[in-house]
């Protein structure tokens, strides 16, 4: 009971929100999405609200739905809301608002405003604690983002099992990957349920978003798939049960999802899940049907495609092909269903779905109201969407439906006809026939029954009938008999129909009769029964039209083939059996002729039989003229042009009957027969021609029937025949049939649709045949057609208008040109009407699509100037226009409307011209130029661009000009050309299209009429430069290329013809292009300028282009790249010639009266630049070209060839250029910048030469008296040698041969700068070529070391000379020895000079040390001791000089230490140590560095040999501390300097020890000990302490570095150390350093006493015997007490800190080294004396009177406990009394530390000391 109560109380405490628990409140308040905990904890709710409300306001601007929350969770009152104070109902209401907001904000969580807003929900309402599930699900789609990581950090630790998947990622502070979430959804039902519920809730709220639905769809689909996979089982029943359970869980979610049609992504996600279910679960048909209906009922326009894919997948899983009714209806309602299914079929299997659609189309055929489904069925087969097996199944479905259709009732005639046509397609199509034949062969269909049902013939062998088939057929016949009997019975009461069945379209009785006749077809008995019906009046058939007109209408109508053939057979039977042979049955002729064109051979055969029967009656006719149904065939008062009987007989006998056999075979034959008959040409050898009157009569007879016939199926067939005949017997088809056309025109669209639907003829076919009535041979054919649409177009059907214009278009080419002109005028006038009328649009389309003659186009063009003149007449008076701004025409609203019409008219005309292949009509050039003039004038008046019109005009002109260019002579009168207008188009328009067209036109005109164009051409190039050249499209590039290709050559030729200077004459052109450079796309610049220069002539114009570019852009990088590219394309002679002309231009620009430079560069003009600035830019660019072009390579290639003429030419031009450069140099010496630039050119020019040629040229130039020139060429040589000079043998020899010239300059020249340049050249030569022949360089070295060079007073020559000697030393090595004496003496003197006070020269100083470095490296043995002494002394002086750099000096000293003999180096150091110390810390450190390097870099043997001098140096250095101390205030080293130097000294000593063995080192050690302990008088206490300090510091390093192998050396120092411990104190400044050194020395000595371990000596030579040194009682007893007594120095906080830091570690290490219980007990006994403040047991003071001493002792105990652990605590019984006393100590620090020690002991022992201490 108690435990249960405790558990309840703990739960209550865990959930408690006690307001007094401030810590918990602060923790909760610091939970934040965007702020760090520390920051969040400092924020109040006002601050948080202000930040979050800003985000909320931004959200409201994004979506107004957020504003609803402004009154609730984001109100001012919300700041005071505390969930812990709200009631349960209030919290529930709050949860609703919070969840609604979270749902809405979920889609925007990656936006800062949304995160700020949610922050308020976290901080104020703590949604992460109270609405955890909803919050997690809101953030879950963003599980990969840092935001989700922030949420994880603030979620409660005790997450529910629903979200247990997140727990490890919350603990690890990492984002969860996708896989665990999918796995959780698969295995954790609550998680998946929560996710589904959340998604549906958000979607119902219309707050769904892509991130959520995409996440959910992916997770849910994978989860369902995973669940189904996991439920696989070897036992089918178990697996089925598990699958059913999963389906039961999933279907409600899908049902809810499908219900939300407007949430398209949710619906698509449900489709995905449905697909997974269908593919992975064995679903029952019921479930599949339900899913399919749900899918079909859920789709919208957005989801149709996905829905169809889903249906296709579901259908594939169905064993049956039948689709559920709702799904089928949804599919059939779709627009373009076949197109959609075709697109899907490329990626998914759709065969079952298509078979289901096929089955649905065939379902319940008798009850189908229309043929829409059968139409779809036909299209499925036509598009062949099914594979062969599925196609066979589909055909089987069609045949099954046809076979069983009578069971459900009679099929409509339309449906029967459609199915019959479809089966005919099966049997006749090349692609479908094999499959159909196979289907028939493999099935047991009764072909005869199928043919009977469809009233058609199936072209296949009937399968053998089985007994069962026969029985079935009997049953079917019985059922058919019942249907026929009932039909006949219903008609038996009908009286004779009053008129002809052809009199009107809609006759209900006829429909009933036709249905009954269809049932009778196939049975003679039934047909006989049917023909005896009273309604048909068979007995009165010769007198009244009912009987025959019925069968005429049937065989002429849209009925199955069998029905039509039987109807014809009935007529034939009647004709052959009639007794009245005097009747004229010519009324049958039009219908029978149409029947002969039927696609079915059977129908044609029956029609031929009927015609033969009529023909036989004519033969029997003796009386004639009694025409059957003459007055009432089509009703009363029909104007039929009946034929006289004998004429009819002639037609039959001469035209029709002879061709019947051919007509049976070929359906098109009768058309040819009638065409030839009516034209008077016989096609049959047995037939004879008809005379013209008879042909006329026959033609008018047929035409009148076509006009009067009310039925459109036979009318259409008759028209199809008649429309082959243009004329017959003096009349035309148009004349005869025009009434029919007018009648047809009068029908409304509804009437036409009704007519065509009833008779199943396409409207388009009828429209086309009607307008085909008008023949092109009719003189006014086009006008007749236009007359049928023009006056009353608004009331006409659009389809009729389209047909009329289609006919006009079709016959246009066959109409005479004069009639075309008239028609075109008419069409044009109509085209100017209201543009939205169908008639106007059709007229315009027609004019655009037909080939208009040139005369028509010319007339149209003449209208443009007239129209614009009329338009100007609408403007204000000329005076007012002149005074108005820009002469603009002011227009009223009415004027604007008129202006719009004029513009539309001009646009249409120019579009017609443009689309009529204007190149084939050169006569249009005049009109087009006039139109261009008018447009240009009008454009300037109205300030409008009119770009489109100009573009059309220019385009047409361009086409004409381009065609004209192909012929030798212009194809039009060139006097009409207006080049000025074309140029103005280029200049004044902003349209790129107009500009390009105008440029191309100028280019073309310059070819065919250059004299008319070139005077206007320059403005074009000016404009091109500012506009066209900057364009980067391919067309503009082509335009520019053509303009350059065609205009420039013509321009140059014109200038030459006029004997003008071509360069100055084209300056404007060049200026245009150079000015445009910066606007031309970078990748096109080179190609464009190259094309321009090539067309102009590279040799003549390249220099000008280069100069203009240089003048305008100076050293612009892009320009330089272009210039380099241009010159690199030229040959070497051309490039050099260009440079020569370029230099000539520079010279010209600097003249008082410039010539061509004024034209090209603007020198001397008002807006021109200063000549000097121009010259500088040109020369700098030229220097760049010399350096970076390929001239050097090209010249070398030429010189390497054997072409003497080419070589001579190059040398001549090069010499000329060199002379030009030198001449310019002489003339511009006073112009500093120009002179410098000219020098750069000279340098670059020389750079094009080989080194040998260069030196040859230099030798000549050095003979000139001009020192500036001589200096310049030597500097050029130095620069050339500094880079990568040639290394070939010839070059090397030539360079060395040049050395005497340079030596001579140094010896004899008074020009210091010239000498300097010569030395620099020698330096380069020695470095690059000295090793080739060192002996030739030595003489130069001697001169450099002489008075003539480094012996001069000028520092520049001195520095250069010393550096040169350094280079020579590196190159020549020992060969340089002859020059060494003088070089050393002078260089040392120069170094000393550079260090004199007030004359410091750092550059000279560095140069000398560089020389010494080189000498030390290459010939160290030549540096004597006195030289080394001098070098060291000067280096000491340099170390103290402020203006000197340290690097060169230090480098030289390092080289001395490394390379010079060790004895010489150490001897020099030993001799000069005192001077180093006098120089100060820096010099001393550097000297020690020399010693260190010498020891380190030389072998051990050298160290051993020089141990005496080395020891001398070390003892002098060790005494530095004492010496400085003795100097007192005069000391030059402070304590830090001494410490630093001693550290370096210790390092040197250790390095020395490494190279010694024990035998060698031990005496030195003992000598050091003696030196430190007894080397001074006893009175010199301070000196002794100083030496001991230095020595002990060394020992500290000694023991610390060499460790256990030198522990034995401690025996030498114990006595000294004990002595020091008794005297030195950390409290005494004079001995503190010594005391510290002692402590550290002992610590290192104790620390590395590693007894028992195998030890490898660092130096194999230093073999020392290792013993258990500090464990020995003699050693331990000697040192332990003095060491522990050091604790007594802890008398105040300062000394206590020092003792604890230094003495305690030493004591600890001693205890570790002692390593035995007895030793530890002895140490502890000594130590505990300092723990007791009172007197000991014997009454003597214990030593711990001072609390600081006790504290230090406690620290020692703590350290020992920590280091030794239980080993030390074996002495605990002895310690316990002391601990008890110390726990009662008066000093708080002591008491605190003893308690720490107690805890430390307890931790080691694992038990409490309480019992032991009591």
From Swiss-Prot:
InterPro entries: ARM-like, ARM-type_fold, BP28_C_dom, HEAT_type_2, HEAT_Utp10/HEAT1, U3snoRNP10_N, UTP10
Keyword Nucleus: yes
Annotated transmembrane regions: 942-962, 998-1018
GO term, biological process aspect, one: positive regulation of transcription by RNA polymerase I
Keyword Transmembrane helix: yes
Top-level lineage group: Eukaryota
Coiled coil, from the record: none
Quaternary organization: Component of the ribosomal small subunit (SSU) processome.
Record's function text: Involved in nucleolar processing of pre-18S ribosomal RNA. Involved in ribosome biosynthesis.
Stated family: Belongs to the HEATR1/UTP10 family.
Name under which the protein is recorded: U3 small nucleolar RNA-associated protein 10
Species, as recorded: Neosartorya fischeri (strain ATCC 1020 / DSM 3700 / CBS 544.65 / FGSC A1164 / JCM 1740 / NRRL 181 / WB 181)
Encoding gene, per UniProt annotation: utp10
